Each structure stands twice: as structure tokens, then as C-alpha cells.
């Protein structure tokens, strides 16, 4: 795997003629994954609103003109009930998100109980709780956490235009703490916040140049929420979004590339192109934290129409190169 990408290389990949880009992405995808399988996760907001951060895209910030109502941390029993329903609906991983800058000790105790309870159902677990230090990641690891989500959101250069209450380096430090604790990393970003080609390339470059590629790479299409600073941001055309998915697949061929927020406004045809470009993971359920997501029956119908099906637990690990394919062949495909 490469960890030495340059911005120029990534910009060149994104800008390839569309048929060539899709060919390279699909070819690499098939070398590591079954292209007919999709990893299914469900995301639940366990603590909504009242966040002290000022992320320009997020309605959970207490600093914006319009914010969602702040709620208390959910009870463990209520979370387990939601996890049971998610498993019944076909999810293999249950993700829990809390609108915190960083969790307090007593809240982390409760989250650890949630992790243990969800794990007992036979589901993988993922949480996103804000910034973590080494001690906090060790506690989560001890509770059995499988994945921790902490997105970079955008390039380091554009980051200051979106967030001022947390530095880019603080995000990287949290990722390092998560990795050092032996927890799988879930890390991606958002397309459509006013960034340019260089910023999109910079985000993918940073992700792919981490010491180890994230096991899961969620790519979000901005959901424009009224009352947030990005509520009237210019929409991104579907082909541009598909190009980012394809480039992420080429640069991080072993990772699960997830279609995250923004799917509610995507057509079936756009979904199909994303899957062809190498996306192999989605969030299932009618809401992602506070924003809408396609209804479960719509996802089932779409996957059925495409001849695709959910991954089983054993298939949901990082991709493994098929024996007939050499590492040199993969690198040549990525850069030629």
C-alpha cells in the first residue's frame, strides 16, 4: 500500500477521463472485495445537540442560528433496544454518536456499558464521541470497541474555513490515540462545503498517507441544513462526487469506502455509479444523527435491483488481495 501520495498525483487521478477512472477503481475494487457485497451499518445519535464546537455544516452546534434541541445521553437499555432493531434490519455494525467536544468520565462509563451491551448481540460497535486522549481510547478498547469514527472533514488548508474550535492536528492526534489503542479507525470527510479540487485531493492525500489506511472511509455529501453557515452552499453534481469515491477506492484499496450522509438526495443511478466506483458500505436507517437517510425498504429495493447483498460479519473485514494479483500491479494501476 502507498502512503506517499502527492497532491498533484491525487488531482490527476480525480481528473482522469471518467471511463478510465471508473475502470481503474472497479478493477482494484474487485481485487480486494466481492463487488456484489455491501457492508451495512446503522448510526444512532445517543446524545443530540448542545455541542460547543462550531462546525459550519452541523445543526448540533449550540453556536448556530438554528440548532437542534439539546438532549441528555440516552439510557443504556434504550440503546440496546435500538441495536436489536438494527440487527433485525440487517445491520452488521451499530454506530453510536454523541455531540461532545470530548466525553466526560462518567459519560464514558455509560458509553462503555452501551458498547458491551451491543457487542453481546453479535454486532460490531463503532462510536464517535469527539476528541480522545490515550487513557480514553484504552477504556474504549477494554470495553470491546471495534471502530472509532473521527473525520478529518476536509483538507488542512480549507479546514479553518469550516471549524475554529478544534485544530486539524487535534483530529490527527485523536486518530493516533485510537490506532495506538488497537481500535480500528473510521475516518473520512465531506464533499460540498465550498472546497475546490485541491482541497478534495488534500483530504484524500492525508487519509491515504496515514501510517495505516483507515479501515473505514466514510465519504459524506453535504446535507445543507437551514440555519447553519453552510445551509445555502452550492450543490455538488453527482459525477464530481462519484470521482471522489473512485479516487478513494484507488488510493485505499483495502478500506471500506462508505456512502454516508447525503444519500437521501441521491438517485438510484447515482448510487449505482458510486457502487461501481468502489463504494461498498452504507448507513441503513431513516436518520443519520439528525439528518435524513433513505428508508430501509428503499435500500433493500435498490440492492436487489443491482443484484447486491449485505456482507456477513466475516466478509466485513478489510479487503485482502487475491493471490493472482501482485502488489506491483496494484501500484501501477493507481499511478499509471
Swiss-Prot record:
Residues 36-263 form the Radical SAM core domain. NCBIfam families: bioB. Belongs to the radical SAM superfamily. Biotin synthase family. It catalyses: (4R,5S)-dethiobiotin + (sulfur carrier)-SH + 2 reduced [2Fe-2S]-[ferredoxin] + 2 S-adenosyl-L-methionine = (sulfur carrier)-H + biotin + 2 5'-deoxyadenosine + 2 L-methionine + 2 oxidized [2Fe-2S]-[ferredoxin]. Its cofactor is [4Fe-4S] cluster; [2Fe-2S] cluster. Keywords: 2Fe-2S, 4Fe-4S, Biotin biosynthesis, Iron, Iron-sulfur, Metal-binding, S-adenosyl-L-methionine, Transferase. This is Biotin synthase. Binds 1 [4Fe-4S] cluster. The cluster is coordinated with 3 cysteines and an exchangeable S-adenosyl-L-methionine. It comes from the Bacteria. Gene3D superfamilies: Aldolase class I. HAMAP family: BioB. One of its GO terms (biological process) is biotin biosynthetic process. [4Fe-4S] cluster binds at residues 51, 55, 58.
